[in-house]
């Protein structure tokens, strides 16, 4: 396949991992500016398209909200399904509990404001957002359809898309209770997710 289709990680690999490392001051700023103080924030970053499974994510969040009334879902990204997802949020009477941020240039700062990260994709390769979220030391809940290579931190969980909404909700609720975030730069480097190192590794893998 052409190189342009094999290396969708350019933005991340040209940046520095320190951009995503947890920063408490940034966390407080983003949460204060966006009315998220006191909320248990579930984050998702991705284009609004079928692959990313937003409709399923809303069903899961409805179950989470039944268990935790302080839960707030924050969605970064844009795309053709955004309006349909907004309509579903209204039908579920959750429009006040779901924040649609759109495309932003400071996604790395938004990761600081999250309490956990959820990626229920129908399929993925090695998702950059999963690396970013773990760089920010976020507990992550990934679809079991995503490669296990992405789960390099001890707080990464995988749940099958055929599992019940309650199973997903309980896994997310458990993730929300982990609040001891620290600088994980050393761990990420040890797991070969240093930006420069991984860029070279992926290029060698895909361009052989």
Language-model-derived ranges and their functions:
Residues 1-11:
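Single conserved hydrophobic/aromatic residue that forms the stacking wall/gate
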Residues 14-33, 208:
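Acidic anion/phosphate-binding donor-loop and adjacent secondary structure
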Residues 40, 44-63, 80-84:
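A conserved mid-protein helix/loop that constitutes part of the nucleotide-sugar donor-binding site
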Residues 86-102:
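Nucleotide-activated donor-binding/catalytic signature segment of Leloir-type glycosyltransferases, i.e.
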Residues 103, 122:
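Aromatic "clamp/platform" in nucleotide-sugar-dependent glycosyltransferases that forms part
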Residues 139-143, 148:
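Short hydrophobic beta-strand element within catalytic cores of glycosyltransferases
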Residues 180-208:
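A charged, aromatic-enriched C-terminal amphipathic alpha-helix characteristic of glycosyltransferases
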């Amino acid at each position: 396949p052409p190189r342009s289709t094999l290396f969708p990680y350019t933005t991340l690999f040209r940046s520095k991992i320190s951009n995503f490392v947890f920063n408490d001051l940034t966390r407080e700023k983003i949460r204060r500016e966006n009315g998220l103080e006191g909320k248990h924030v579930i984050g998702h970053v991705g284009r609004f398209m079928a692959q990313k499974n937003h409709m399923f994510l809303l069903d899961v969040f409805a179950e989470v909200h039944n268990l935790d009334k302080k839960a707030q879902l924050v969605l970064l990204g844009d795309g053709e399904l955004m309006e349909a997802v907004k309509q579903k949020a209204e039908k579920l009477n959750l429009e006040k509990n779901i924040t649609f941020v759109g495309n932003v240039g400071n996604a790395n700062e938004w990761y600081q404001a999250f309490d956990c990260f959820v990626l229920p994709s129908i399929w993925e390769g090695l998702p950059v957002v999963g690396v970013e979220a773990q760089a920010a030391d976020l507990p992550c809940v990934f679809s079991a359809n995503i490669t296990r290579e992405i789960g390099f931190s001890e707080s990464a969980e995988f749940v099958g898309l055929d599992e019940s909404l309650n199973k997903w909700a309980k896994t997310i609720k458990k993730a929300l209770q982990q609040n001891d975030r620290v600088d994980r730069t050393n761990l990420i480097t040890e797991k070969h997710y240093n930006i420069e190192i991984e860029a070279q590794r992926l290029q060698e893998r895909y361009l052989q």
